[in-house]
Each structure stands twice: as C-alpha cells, then as structure tokens.
Amino acid sequence: MPPAAVRRAPYRDFLQPALQRRFASTTGFLLALAYVEAVTLSRWNHLFWPWFPIGLPGIRTLAIFGSILPIIILRIAHSHMGLRTSNSPIDTIRRTAFSLATLETVITFAVSAWLFSQTYLFSIPADSNLGWITYYSGDRARLNERALFYTVNLIILGIVQGVIHISLDYDRMLLGRVKPRREGDANDRPPTGWEKFTEAAPAVVVRAGMLSMVVALVNYVVLYHFLRRWAWSWALSFFRIFYNLPKSNIPPSQAPWSLLMLGRSIWAGFLLCLLWYVADMAFRLQLGKEPLKNNQPLSAESKDPNGSLLNGLKSKKTRVSAFAMWELALIARDFDARRQAIFEDIDRKDGPMWSQLYVTCLSVLKAVEERVDNYGKPPTPPPAPAETAPQQPPPRLVQPPKDDNVWAPTAPPKGLRGAVGKVVNNVITSPGKTPAEVYLPEAKKRALEATDRILTQEQKDMLRPENVNTMVHTLAFKVLSTPTIGPVFQQLFGRRLTTAVFGQPYGEPSIYVNAAYAVSKLAVSSLAEDRYGNVQRDVPALIRTFTTIIKKLERFRDTLPIHWTDLRKTRECAEVEELLDALKDGLGELVTAFSPYSTDLRLTRADMRLAREAAEKPQRAAEAPAEQPRVPAVENGAAAAADGNAEPEMRQLR
C-alpha cells in the first residue's frame, strides 16, 4: 500500500496566525498606553488609588481603550498592500473622496473622538464644571456649554485626522526589501521594532501636539461660532429626554470661552492624537516585521515547507504573495539549509522546486516589461465569440407570407391629376428658407460692425485665439505654482512613471525587488549547492531576461515625456530606481559568477557584453552643490515611500 500523500498546508495558514499575533501584541501595547493616559487623568488626592488598576483607573483605562478600538478594527479591515498609483493627487481624490472606505474612515475617527471626549469629561473632577448638566439656581437643570465645546472640538479633530489618514494612506502595509550583504556588514543586524519606535517617538509627540494645537485654535477662533447654534440645538434635543430643560433652543448670549478652556482642549486633543499616532506606528512596525518565527521562516513549521512556500508565491492575493516573496528572498540570503532543500527538491508534480520558483519570479518581473511595452496602447479588445453556422430552416409546404410594409402609403396616382398634386405638396411643405438661415448672417454682420466700432485694435489682438490660449496657460501656471493648491494638480514625472511601471490602482514595489534578488541569489548559490545541475539550464535565459528588462526600463524612463504641469522638470523616481538597482545587483552577480562558464552555457560575447553594460550603475550626483534648495519632506515622499520604515508624514499625497 503506497504511503499517504503529505497534505501541503497553504501558506496563509502560517501567515494569518503570525499577523494575528502581531495584532494582539499591538493591542496589548495600546492597552498599556491607555492605562498611562488614565493615570494622567486621575485626581492625585491619594498615594495609592489614583494608579491602582482595580478601581477607577482600570475602568478609565477600558474606556480609553474602547475609544481606540474602532481604529484598530478599521486598520484590520482596510489594510492593503502597495502604494496608491495615480498620475496626480487630483486623480486620487477623484477616485477615493466619495468612496465607502473614505466615509467609513472619517466616521470611525469621529466616533473614536466622541468616545474619548466623553471619557475625558467624566474623568475631570466635578469642581472643573465640565459636566453636561449644571444647576445655576434652585433645582432647574441647564445644559453646560463647556462640555459641548470640548465635544465639538474633539469631533472636529477626529474628522481632520480621518481626512489625513486617507490622504497619506495610513492603511498601507509597508514591507521590507531584501538587499545583498556587502563585505563588512555581515554581522550588522537590522534595528528591532522597539529601536525604531524609540527613534521615531519624539516626532510622533510633536505631530500629536501640533495637530491638536492647530485644530483647537481654529475651532476656538472660527469654527465654533458657526457650529454653536446647531450643536446646542442637537444637545438640547438629546438631553431633554432625561432632564427637564428649557424649551428654547437659543444658546446663551455669552459663550463660556476662556484661555483655560483652550488649554484643556489642546491637552485633551493631544492625548487623543497620541493614541492615534502610536497605534498607527505600532501597526506599521508590527505588520512590517520579517516573515519569521523563532528566527526561522514561517513555512518552516509546515510538513512540506517548500510546497507551502510555493503555494504562497502562486497565491492570487497580493498580501500572501508579497509575504511569500519576502520569505523566499530571506531564504536565498540567510538560510543555507532551506536553500539546499530547494535545489534538492526535484520530485514535485509540476516540476522541480527550482523550476517553479524560476518561472514564478520571472513572471513577476515580466509583468513590469509587459506594462512598459503596452504603455500608451489602446486596450486589447476581448476576443469575438466564434461564429456558428446558421441553421437551415425546414422546407416550407406553403408560400411564405409577404414581408411588404403594410403601413406604407399607397403609390401616387399617375397622370395630370397626380402631377398637379405633387407640385402643390412641394409648395406647401417647402415654404422657403428658415428664419435662422435668413437672420443669422445679418446678425453676424452687425456683431462684427459693433466690434469694430467699440473695441480698440489692442483689444482685438487680445481676443485672438492664440492670445487667449496664452492667457489661459499663464493663469494655469500661476495656479500650479501656488504652494497649497498647485501640487494637487501637478502630474509629476515620478508619479506617472510609478503608475506606468507598477500598474493601477495599487502597486507593491517590494514584490519585484525581492523577486529579482531571490532568483539571482539562488542562481549564484547553485554553483556550490546544486548537486543535480538543474539551475544551469536556466541561467542563460535568466541573464538575457534581466538584461532586456533593465534596457527597456531605462529606455522608458529616459523617453517618457515630462507633463506640462510638472514644474520640477526632474526625471526622478525612487521606486523605479530601487527596482533598477535590484535588477542591476542581481545581474552583476550573475555575470561575475557565471562569466567563466559562458561558453559552456552558450552565452555569446554579445550577450555578456550587453549584460555587463546593463549591470553598470551610473555615478550618483555626489558632487551636487550644497546650496541646492531642499525639497520639503511632505512633498518628497517618493524616497520615503520606498523605505519600509519611512514615517507617514514623509509620504506624499497619493
């Protein structure tokens, strides 16, 4: 009896638990931060109870954590792979502004802010007079506008943060890129998540304080004046259900504004923004961790590690395939035993493990080549359905019915009477020229005469089509040069090149970078580890494919025209340059390793010469003048987006 086949567990069976563990650790960290904020809101009239978790601080901690819980759910539901690709920010706004995801995000942040505002109001001591209901004289209840002011301020802060969250695409999962280890940095280890967090913590605190201060000042000076009557009416309608409040919806004549209220609102907003930003950073650091468990690849726990990894690489879901490609690149660089197992796995159903990895990685890289080749071409129409032969009707036993038009008028009578009737009909139905044909030429003539009498020669010259076009272009350039509005409409070269190379609506550069490194590193390692010689058959095609893709990418980058709205006029694109660097590094290692065997591999001198030329990297502009103006960090987001650990404020609006 043959042994039972080993079940190949899908790669997602190992990836999903790892992501869930990271979500859980992030949630625990946020719970600890909620406890710290709960302690800061305690009234320190005792040495023990203000911080003891079993008591009011614990209840307050759960309430604060409940305000951040909708954001955690939102991040889990809306997280996606790849950067948003579009030619300009206005294209992104048009695509996402009125989508359901945008509406959910803004509402979720507003709800989170409202929950935190109520927790903050109930945590403040009673002598601060921040309760919703107050009693001025006797037992008559009155609505306290102080509480209304704090609530409105934090809800506005939530709406603003929701817009920022969508604009800077905080839902994107940032994955790492595996790069070759150079001589001298073999012992260097990447920074841990905690080291990254402590390094970025000061910037997070500053961002939280700045956003809270700006929103509080704008609300204090401008917004609350317009929202006051509506918010007062809504609050009265709600609290009349529980209290005997006045029937008048007119707010008090004097609003209770003071510098103390402004300071309290800034502090409350700072605590809330700190929760949001720390949650965002924790999610990015946790979800951007390498696909390892106990310093081993995730698929190592499978009974068939290579099969599970191959399942992930062939997955249709971008998240699964991206993590699997990242793991393959790590295996190619750091795990000798797994790399050896790949070369020795030759008895698979669909071919040796190396052959399937080779085809998968090259199909990923050739997708870039295909997009470049098809750029600017009309989409291929779907194939027409095959024409079927018409069925022959059965023979008729009787004559078919006539197909003449039964509603057609009868033929006019012939003779003198018919001729006279035809002439009369033509006279009646063709009375002459229409009013437009009669009066329109005369109106044009009168308008030209009036123009000659009223306008001067200079004014006539200004109204010529070429001068009007010049005025329109001048106005357009003035709008594009505006620092606040102009960048929204500019089609920068980097954005257009990224969109063309990585596709729409999302493109994940790490998949292509890791694929280029993994397949080239495995091929180079096969010289010492491939006992069966399966890899050498594919090396010539691999070198030629890398050479072709590099040449096409560089030609496309150098020939893509700069759009007239691009005022920078620079051919810079960090994402595409990073992909080119990965391809050049891989091709350079292939040429160096297999150059002595080029004749045996049937690689001609022309092939090797073209490969060496393609693998050469241009000299970077290290001697650039120091006084060159620095591009603001918010706009220069391409380089930051290419870095998996870039701060969100360093990203551009995509």
Task: Report each predicted region and the residues it spans.
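HEAT/armadillo-like alpha-solenoid scaffolds in large eukaryotic assembly and transport factors
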Residues: 84-92, 141, 170-185, 289-298, ...
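Short coil/turn segments at helix-helix junctions and helix-capping linkers
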Residues: 143, 258, 262, 266, ...
